[in-house]
């Protein structure tokens, strides 16, 4: 059954106009992006199959152009449309979260980066630099890869802090396993940066470890 054969009230575009985007399911929103189906499938069937292939939005968010276009019915043009929409969503999320964002509690720091970091396949060590009002003034990825105290050097962390005239900073890194429990290396890095910050007068407020929809604050755990 082609989309044009559906009643108006069941077509995704008409439903969006009549009831709002928030009322549409994920596969209906994706169908609007795809626009057309195949000879054998309506666009709604194609979008449903695409989501099933990637186990929903979680893995679709990480898909490459090659992975998308390898799926029957999804050529390069449709793959590019999907990737562009995903990137716009990330950028909008980034603007909403980072516009004079204030960090006062561990939850604030976790929420600031959870959307960006929870699905990363490698560990990313990020420093968030704050002014005297605890407003975010800059964010920098210092290191990508397995964390240890010899690789995360204080020089790289504090060079950016001094450049930005930061009053304090927060470290955030992810555990791709989804389990945010701190390792011995996590604790060692935290203590080393804390000691360096005391010497320079730039306080390490916390070290947040991001898991899958959960986090651990090393300050709350007593390591700072």
Swiss-Prot record:
Disulphide linkage map: none
Matching Gene3D superfamilies: 5' to 3' exonuclease, C-terminal subdomain, Cytidine Deaminase, domain 2
Transmembrane segments: none
Motif (JAMM motif): 173-186
Protein name: UPF0758 protein BLi02933/BL00636
UniProt similarity note: Belongs to the UPF0758 family.
Domain MPN: 102-224
NCBIfam families for the chain: PRK00024.1, radc
GO process terms (BP): proteolysis
GO molecular function annotations of the record: metal ion binding; metallopeptidase activity
UniProt KW Ubl conjugation keyword: no
Organism per entry: Bacillus licheniformis (strain ATCC 14580 / DSM 13 / JCM 2505 / CCUG 7422 / NBRC 12200 / NCIMB 9375 / NCTC 10341 / NRRL NRS-1264 / Gibson 46)
Pfam families: RadC, UPF0758_N
SUPFAM superfamilies in alphabetical order: JAB1/MPN domain, RuvA domain 2-like
Entry keywords, A to Z: Hydrolase, Metal-binding, Metalloprotease, Protease, Zinc
Domain of life: Bacteria
InterPro entries in the cross-refs: MPN (IPR037518), RadC_JAB (IPR025657), RuvA_2-like (IPR010994), UPF0758 (IPR001405), UPF0758_CS (IPR020891), UPF0758_N (IPR046778)
Sequence positions that bind Zn(2+): 173, 175, 186
């Amino acid at each position: 059954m082609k989309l044009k054969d559906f009643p108006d009230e069941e077509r995704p575009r008409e439903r969006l106009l009549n009831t709002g985007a928030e009322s549409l399911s994920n596969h209906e929103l994706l169908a609007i992006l795809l626009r057309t189906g195949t000879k054998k499938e309506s666009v709604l069937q194609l979008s449903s199959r695409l989501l099933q292939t990637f186990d929903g939005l979680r893995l679709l968010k990480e898909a490459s152009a090659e992975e998308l276009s390898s799926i029957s019915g999804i050529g390069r043009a449709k793959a590019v449309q999907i990737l562009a929409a995903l990137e716009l969503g990330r950028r909008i999320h980034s603007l909403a979260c980072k516009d004079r964002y204030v960090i006062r509690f561990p939850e604030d720091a976790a929420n600031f980066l959870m959307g960006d970091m929870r699905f990363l396949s490698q560990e990313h060590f990020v420093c968030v630099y704050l002014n005297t009002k605890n407003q975010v003034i800059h964010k920098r990825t210092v290191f990508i890869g397995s964390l240890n105290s010899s690789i995360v050097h204080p020089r790289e962390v504090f060079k950016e802090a001094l450049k930005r005239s930061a009053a304090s900073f927060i470290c955030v890194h992810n555990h791709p396993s989804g389990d945010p429990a701190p390792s011995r290396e996590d604790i060692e890095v935290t203590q080393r940066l804390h000691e360096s910050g005391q010497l320079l007068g730039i306080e390490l407020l916390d070290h947040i470890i991001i898991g899958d929809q959960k986090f651990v604050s090393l300050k709350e755990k007593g390591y700072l």
